[in-house]
């Protein structure tokens, strides 16, 4: 794939080693007389240790950042009151299904967020034409519309809910997050209440960055290591707080990745519902 800068509109505001040794062994030979047993054969192979993978340099991570990442928001039909901008990021269910079919017909294989980050950081293998599907904000339609279609296609995806809205009407519940997680989907954080991270001060860092990770970890029973920035906006100060909070990687939208910390500024594009199949495939090839 060839890289080029792709500027995407920001998201709509929402109301969230192990070591393996080859041990020496001794095999005894039984005797029926008083003569001493023959010497026991002993393995001469030295113990082996499986070293943990070595993280790539920032330059290596940037060079691997050619996997397309798509960002979706609400999955529902448009309404008369929807603004022109809202219509660019609200995907009708029929269009969503057509987009998934295009991805399949194009030979792409959706991967998990963890698999993509492993590839970027360590160079682990991915399918021939990988793509990452992400869903921001925590809308209930991610479960009611998105999950069944993803399951029907056999696709994996990553969901980034804001934690303030969990359990509220029309938003994802904790039980639904657990079900998505058990199905092999990735769950990441999207702040507490969708504040821009480039405007956070003081205790807001704890509320918006640290606490959502802790809550999602508690809900799922395992660490949550990924996050997505509301509106796709980030700052140098935010990168330090994201690292300190324990996140492994973070996703923005269309800006260039930070050359020093590319894992914390992974790019995504938002496919508008007006894109037909060829346009979607062309952008998967050209935008990364």
Which residues are covered by each model-predicted region?
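N-terminal export signals
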Residues: 5-21
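C-terminal active-site subregion of NodB/CE4 polysaccharide deacetylases
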Residues: 20-22, 29-133, 140-142, 178, ...
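Histidine-centered divalent metal-coordination motifs
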Residues: 73, 190, 194
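Residue-level marker for buried hydrophobic side chains located in beta-strands
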Residues: 133-134, 187
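Acidic (Asp/Glu)-rich catalytic clusters
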Residues: 147-152, 172-188
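Glycine-enriched alpha-helix->loop->beta-strand junction motifs that scaffold or abut catalytic
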Residues: 153-155, 183-184, 245-248
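A short, conserved beta-to-alpha structural element at the edge of catalytic cores
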Residues: 155-174
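Short beta-strand and adjacent tight-turn residues that come in two discontinuous sequence segments
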Residues: 160, 190, 250-252
């Amino acid at each position: 794939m060839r890289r080029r800068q792709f500027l995407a509109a920001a998201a709509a505001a929402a109301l969230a080693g192990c070591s393996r040794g080859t041990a020496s062994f001794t095999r005894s030979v039984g005797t029926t007389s008083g003569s001493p047993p023959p010497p026991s054969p002993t393995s001469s192979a030295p113990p082996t240790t499986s070293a943990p993978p070595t993280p790539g340099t920032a330059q290596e991570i940037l060079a691997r950042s050619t996997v397309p990442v798509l960002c979706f928001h609400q999955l529902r039909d448009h309404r008369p009151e929807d603004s022109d901008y809202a219509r660019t990021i609200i995907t009708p269910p029929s269009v969503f299904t057509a987009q998934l079919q295009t991805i399949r017909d194009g030979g792409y294989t959706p991967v998990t967020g963890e698999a993509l980050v492993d590839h970027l950081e360590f160079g682990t293998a991915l399918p021939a034409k990988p793509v990452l599907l992400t869903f921001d904000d925590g809308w209930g339609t991610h479960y009611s519309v998105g999950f069944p279609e993803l399951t029907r296609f056999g696709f994996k995806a990553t969901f980034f809910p804001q934690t303030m809205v969990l359990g509220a009407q029309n938003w994802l519940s904790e039980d639904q997050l657990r079900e998505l997680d058990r199905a092999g989907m990735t769950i990441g954080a999207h702040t507490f209440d969708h504040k821009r991270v480039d405007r956070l001060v003081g205790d807001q860092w704890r509320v918006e960055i640290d606490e959502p990770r802790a809550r999602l970890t508690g809900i799922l029973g395992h660490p949550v290591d990924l996050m997505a920035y509301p509106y796709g906006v980030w700052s140098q100060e935010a990168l330090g707080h994201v690292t300190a909070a324990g996140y492994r990687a973070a996703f923005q939208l269309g800006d260039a990745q930070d050359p020093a910390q590319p894992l914390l500024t992974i790019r995504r594009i938002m496919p508008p519902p007006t894109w037909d199949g060829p346009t979607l495939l062309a952008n998967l090839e050209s935008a990364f």
